[in-house]
Amino acid sequence: MAQSKHVYFFGDGKADGRTDMKDLLGGKGANLAEMTNIGLPVPAGFTITTEVCTYFYAHDKTYPKDLKAQVEAALAAVGRITGKKFGDAQNPLLVSVRSGARASMPGMMDTVLNLGLNDMTVEAVAEKSGDRRFAQDSYRRFITMYSNVVLGIEHHHFEEILDDHKDRHGYSLDTDLNADDWAQIIVRYKERVEEESGKPFPQDPHDQLWGAIGAVFGSWMIQRAITYRRLHNIPESWGTAVNVQAMVFGNMGETSATGVAFTRNPSTGEKKLYGEFLINAQGEDVVAGIRTPQEITEEARRESGSDKPSMEKAMPEAFAELKRIHAALEKHYRDMQDLEFTVEQGKLWMLQTRNGKRTAKAALRIAVELANEKLISRQEAVTRIEPGSLDQLLHPTIDPAAERKIFVSGLPASPGAACGEIVFSPDEAELLKSQGHKVILVRVETSPEDIHGMHAAEGILTTRGGMTSHAAVVARGMGKPCVSGAGSLRVDYRAQTMTAGGTTLKKGEILTIDGSTGQVLVGKVPMTQPALAGEFATLMQWADAARKLKVRANADTPADARAAVKFGAEGIGLCRTEHMFFDEDRIRAVREMILAGDEAARRVALAKLLPMQRKDFAELFEIMGALPVTIRLLDPPLHEFLPHGEEEIAEVAKAMGADPKALEDRARELHEFNPMLGFRGCRLAIAYPEIAEMQARAIFEAAVEVSRKTRKPVVPEIMVPLIATKAELDLVKERIDAVAKMVAAETKSPVKYQVGTMIELPRAALKAGEIAETAEFFSFGTNDLTQTAFGISRDDAASFLNIYTARGILPSDPFVSIDREGVGELIRIATERGRKVRKDIKLGIGGEHGGDPSSVMFCAEVGLDYVSCSPFRVPIARLAAAQAALAQRHKKA
C-alpha cells in the first residue's frame, strides 16, 4: 500500500506544493511553495500537512508511523541545498519551526527560531560566521523561545536574568552586550530551565525538532487561538500545518536585517510600499517593541521625522530587490500582500507572503484600484469586501491615534462613536438637545417610552440587554452608536451617578462611547467622520449592477427616510407607526384614547391624532417619491403608552385633568403577563377597529395630497401585523377597503393601495397559502418569528444565548442571523405556499435580519423580492445582496 504524503518540500526553485493547496499546507506553507515555484529567493524547507494535525488530535497526540522517515528525508534535502547538515558539529543546519493555518491567524500560534543550536553547534556557528557574539545571541534567543513554546516556561524567568545582568554591568540596551555577556547569560538560562522543568535543556537537535513540531500542533488548541477562531468563524477541524525552514539570519551584523512590509498601506489602501525593518535583528524584535523599527522607504522616514536611516538608504540593493519582489507578488496574487523578509549579509530572503489584513477603508480602495488596474474584475472587487465591515465607514469612528481611557466595556450593539454629556432621563436628553447640548443617554435598559430621548441623544449606553435588545435594535435603526449590556456598570437614577471599577461619574460629565468595540471612555476623544463618495460610491454602483434582491429601509420618521434615500434604499419596507405616537404632543391624545370609556370617546381622541399621522405619512411619501412605502398598523400593546409608577401616573393624570385612580386602574387592567403574545397587532385592530380606520384614513388622505402636489401616483402598502388566521386579515382589510372608498368619494380622487401582512407567527407561515388569497404582499417579521418559533424572549435571551453558541447548541445567535433550519424553513414554506396561490405576491423581510449579510444571502436563495433594514445598514445589505447574486451565478456556471 502506498504511503500517505505528509511532508511537502520546497527549495532551489522547485516545490511539491502550490498556492491552491492551503487546505493541506496552510496559508504559509502554500505561499512558501508558490514563491519558490515563481523563482523568488525562499530559504529551503518543508511543510508538515494539516492532516497530520488532525491525526495528532485524533490519536492521543501521536504521529502517523511514516512521518518520521519523511521528515528525515526532507531535512537531508534542505541540507544538500544549503551545504549544511542538521546536528553536524562542524557545519550545522539551523531551522525555524512555524505554524501555518488555512486562514491567517497573525500572532495566534507559536514559533521557534534558531533550532539546532546546542553547546556544541553554537561554537561551530561562531567559527563559520566569524562572529561569536552573533552565535551566542542566536543561542540565547533559541533557549528563550524553545523553553517558552515547548517547555512551558514563562518569558519573565529569562527577562529577570537578562535585566539583572544589564543592571549589574550598567547596560541599557541588548545591543550593548558582547559575546561573553551572552555566554554568561546562557549558563544562567540553562540553570533556570532545569530548575523550572526538572530536566536539562535538550541538546539533541532531533529531540528539539520533534519537541517544537509537537508544540506547534499543540498551539492550535491554546486559549488565544481558540478565541481567535471563534471570533473569526474558523473551524477547529481545519488544524494547522507546521513549516520547517532553513534559518537565514538578520542578526549577523550591520549588513543583515529583518522586516515586515505591505505592498499597499493597510490603513488607507494607498499604493505604496509600507512597513518597517531593523538592522542586525531577528523577526521577533520587530514586533516585540524592544527597539524602535526603522522605515523601509526614504519618503516614509521623512514623514515620520525619524533620524534613523531607511532601508532604501542603508541597504539600496536589498531594497531594490524587495521593490521588484513586492510588485511581482501583488501581480501574481492579485491582492495586497503582507511580506516578511530577512536580509542576511546583504542577500534578501522571503519568509512569508499572505493577503494582508486591512481596514474597511483600505479594503474598499484596494478592491476598486485593483479592478481599475485590470488585475481583478469589478465583480471580484465586489466579492472582496466583507459587507459587515462597511459599518466602520458609515459612522464617525474614534481616531486610531487617540488615547483611550476606558471607564467600562459592554457589547458593541450599534457601531460608530459618540460623545456628550451624561444624562439619565429621556426627557432631560430631549430638553438638553433642544438647548444645543450633545448628550449620551445612560439607562439600565430602554423601552419604547424612551424613544424621544434616544432620538435626542448622540449615543446610548445600557447596563442590561444584548446585541438584539430594544436599545440595540432601535439605536441601529436610528444610526446611533450604542453600547449595551455593560453589566459591571451601576446606575443610580436617584443620585444621578454611574459607577464602574471604583470610579463614579455624575450627570453632566463628558463621556465617549465606541459602539464598534463596546468601550466606554472618559472625556472627549477625537473622532474621524465618514465619507461616502469616492471608492465607496464606485463599489456600491458595481454591487447594484450585480444584485437582484431589492433593498428597502425601516424608517419611522422623515429623518430616517432621508437617511434611507442617502444610503441607496429602494423604498421603505417597514414604517412602525407606534414610534410616531411617543412625541409629547401626541402621547396625550393616545392616552385619552386608551382611557376612553366607549367608542365615541375613543373616536374623539383619535380625531386629534388624525392630522398628525396624515402629516407624518405625507412627509414620508414626499421624501420617497415614487418608491414603495410599507406602513405597519399599530402593533404594540396599549399599556406601553401609559405611565408606570405612582409618581408618573399622578403627574400624567394632573397634566391630562384625569382621575389618577382611573388612570392607575386602566394601567393595571391593561397589564399583561406576556405582552409579546398578548393584546397587540391585528388583535387591537379587531377589538378597536376605529384605530385602524384612523390610520388608514391618514394614509389615504396623505397619499392623495402628495399625489396631487407631485403629480405622481402614490401607492401605499398597508401591513396588518401579527395575524395568525386568514379571517383576522379579512376583517381588518374590510375596514381598510371601506375607508378607502370613503376617502375616494370625499376627495374625488381614486385611491390606489395594497394590503398585506407581516408573517411573524409559525401558524401564519404554515397557512400562507390561505392568507395569500387576501394578502397582496408578505413581509416576514423575523424578529417575532424567531421569538415564537424558538419560544425565546429576545430581550431576555442575552443571559443564556451566548452559552448556547459557545457550546455549539446553536451555530449563531438566531436574532442576529436567521436560523436557516427552523425559522428559515418556515419562511421557505410560506414563500412556496404563498406564491402557489398568488403568483405576483411580493415577498420581503423586515427587522434587523435584513441588514445581516448571512441572512441576506439566505433571502436571495429563497427567492424573496426584497430585504428591509435600518437605514445605516442599507449599504451592507446592498453589498451582501450583490455577493449572493454572484455566488448563485457562480454555482450555476
Regions found by a protein language model. Name each.
Residues 1-405, 431, 437-440, 447-452, ...:
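Nucleotide/phosphate-binding sheet-loop regions of phosphoryl- and nucleotidyl-transfer enzymes
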Residues 14-21, 414-456, 823-840:
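C-terminal accessory/binding modules appended to enzymatic or scaffolding proteins
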Residues 46, 463-465, 484-487, 575, ...:
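Short beta->alpha connector loops at strand-helix junctions that form conserved
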Residues 69, 229-231, 382-439, 445, ...:
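Long, charged amphipathic helices and adjacent flexible linkers at domain junctions
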Residues 70, 488-521, 526:
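S4-like RNA-binding module at protein N-termini
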Residues 77-88, 498-501, 708, 741-750:
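Short mixed-charge
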Residues 98-99, 532-535, 542-893:
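Conserved alpha/beta-domain cores
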Residues 458-464, 482, 844:
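A short, small-residue-rich loop immediately preceding and capping a beta-strand
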